[in-house]
């Protein structure tokens, strides 16, 4: 009896393991085996032909070279197929396995989450190999977030892992304003990773791998376990790339932003999200110290602060308003994203506590944010080149120069702020001393009341911060 061509079938249906399993179960006769093999060969041939016919600027790598993101310093971007990455990940020694984790993206299903030296991947209890399309290199992870799941009676948390090139609006397609697609990374997965954990501790027998014993000590809760394990692999990846600052797990913080809308299911807890639609899809906006994230439906969108050109508002009604964010998507092109139906109660918090805090409403500040980002990226590239042994001395010199430029930009910004303060002092009227002092006292008392009133609500959040 002939056998299924599992390699071709895996390439064609890498994002649909349910279909692949169904084919394996249905292949109970030579005729069906041949039929499935012929279908896989035909589809793969068509996909490859379609990719070859497309212009280079619009070509999307399919199956045999399914990649995503922007390459980091010394990552290889060519000649690495998805099957090669899966095989490479499967061959590495398993450091830690966390069983029965609820994954939502790329696929909604329970998987075992596996951590090795170079990879994080998902697999099932029935198959020791990684699931095709669910393998990520640590070096390709650019952002990690730890966020509460909105509107749940029982507290749950989402972890979001964003590889390079998977979170900007023009990541996978040609931008309508002329931006080029971002360069591919070396991960087999073309999507972010999103999984959900409960507030409870892992059940006995949920951990396996080389460091399972050490991990058990940190497993007071799922969040404390993940926050103990993941940063170690991110730091190691940063070291391999020659970067001084590893990727951090960024958590939501009610002191950074808290919604004014009261949560009916957990009234004593401040909400750190705002309901918002993107097109016809409903979701939630999180205003974080590194940028604005919209989730948790595909496609996830993250807008880093240093890529935001401006923020404006439209359709301001009695109960709702829309927020428009203009984003730098590369090569001098920008794209506008509109988030609609935000609650009017949150306008003040968004506009004053976040947008004005980071000067996101001021287009003139966007160039400075962009310059700082590019200087920092160039410095990182210099460090990565030195780590790879390629033009090490030149890369180090470039890194020093770029860091000098970055410090210069920061000093110029500090001088600008100082000049504004000096202008305020020149406009100061000595005759209003009494009133000013009185107003200052009142303001301080109000600030004190605000801090005190927030302590009770921050207790729950502090527990989450301890986990970090």
UniProtKB/Swiss-Prot annotation:
One of its GO terms (molecular function) is DNA binding. This is Histone chaperone RTT106. Interacts with histones H3 and H4. Residues 390-400, 419-468 have a biased composition (Acidic residues). Residues 65-82 have a biased composition (Polar residues). It comes from Pyricularia oryzae (strain 70-15 / ATCC MYA-4617 / FGSC 8958). Its main location: nucleus. The lineage of its organism: Eukaryota, Fungi, Dikarya, Ascomycota, Pezizomycotina. InterPro entries: PH-like_dom_sf, RTT106/SPT16-like_middle_dom, RTT106/SSRP1_HistChap/FACT. It is found in: Nucleus; Chromosome. It holds the Pfam family Rttp106-like_middle. Belongs to the RTT106 family. PANTHER family: FACT COMPLEX SUBUNIT SSRP1, HISTONE CHAPERONE RTT106. Histones H3 and H4 chaperone involved in the nucleosome formation and heterochromatin silencing. Required for the deposition of H3K56ac-carrying H3-H4 complex onto newly-replicated DNA. Plays a role in the transcriptional regulation of the cell-cycle dependent histone genes by creating a repressive structure at the core histone gene promoter. Keywords: Chaperone, Chromosome, DNA-binding, Nucleus, Transcription, Transcription regulation. It comes from the Eukaryota.
């Amino acid at each position: 009896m002939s056998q299924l061509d599992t390699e071709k079938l895996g390439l064609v249906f890498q994002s649909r393991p349910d279909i692949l399993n169904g084919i394996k179960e249905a292949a109970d006769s030579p005729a069906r085996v041949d039929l499935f093999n012929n279908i896989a060969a035909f589809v793969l041939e068509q996909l490859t032909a379609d990719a070859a016919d497309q212009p280079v600027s619009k070509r999307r790598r399919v199956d045999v070279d399914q990649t995503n993101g922007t390459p980091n310093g010394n990552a290889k971007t060519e000649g690495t197929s998805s099957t090669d990455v899966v095989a490479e990940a499967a061959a590495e020694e398993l450091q830690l396995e966390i069983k029965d984790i609820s994954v939502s993206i790329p696929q909604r299903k329970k998987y075992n989450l596996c951590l090795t030296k170079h990879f994080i991947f998902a697999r099932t209890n029935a198959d020791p190999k990684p699931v095709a399309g669910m393998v990520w290199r640590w070096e390709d992870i650019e952002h990690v977030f730890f966020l509460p799941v909105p509107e749940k009676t029982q507290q749950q948390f989402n972890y979001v892992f964003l590889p390079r090139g998977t979170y900007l609006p023009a990541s996978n397609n040609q931008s309508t304003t002329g931006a080029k697609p971002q360069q591919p990374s070396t991960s087999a997965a073309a999507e972010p990773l999103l999984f959900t954990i409960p507030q409870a501790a892992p059940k006995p027998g949920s951990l396996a791998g080389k460091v399972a014993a050490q991990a058990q000590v940190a497993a007071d809760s799922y969040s404390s376990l993940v926050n103990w394990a993941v940063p170690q692999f991110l730091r190691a990846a940063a070291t391999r790339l020659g970067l001084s600052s590893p990727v951090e797990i960024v958590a939501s913080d009610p002191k950074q932003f808290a919604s004014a809308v009261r949560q009916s299911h957990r009234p004593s807890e401040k909400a750190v999200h705002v309901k918002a639609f993107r097109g016809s899809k409903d979701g939630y906006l999180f205003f974080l110290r590194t940028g604005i994230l919209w989730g948790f439906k595909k496609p996830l969108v993250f807008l880093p602060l240093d890529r935001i050109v401006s923020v404006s508002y439209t359709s301001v009604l009695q109960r709702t308003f829309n927020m428009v964010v203009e984003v730098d998507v590369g090569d001098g092109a920008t794209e506008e994203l509109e988030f609609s139906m935000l609650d009017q109660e949150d306008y003040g918090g968004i506009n004053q506590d976040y947008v004005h805090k980071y000067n996101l409403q001021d287009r003139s500040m966007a160039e400075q944010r962009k310059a700082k980002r590019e200087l920092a990226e160039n410095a990182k590239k210099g460090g990565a080149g030195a780590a790879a042994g390629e033009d090490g001395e030149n890369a180090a010199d470039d890194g020093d120069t770029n860091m000098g430029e970055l410090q210069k930009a920061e000093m110029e910004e500090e001088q600008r702020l100082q000049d504004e303060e000096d202008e305020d002092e020149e406009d100061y009227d000595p005759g209003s001393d009494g009133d000013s002092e009185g107003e200052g006292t009142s303001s301080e008392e109000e600030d004190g009341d605000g801090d005190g009133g927030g302590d009770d609500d921050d207790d729950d959040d502090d527990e989450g911060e301890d986990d970090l």
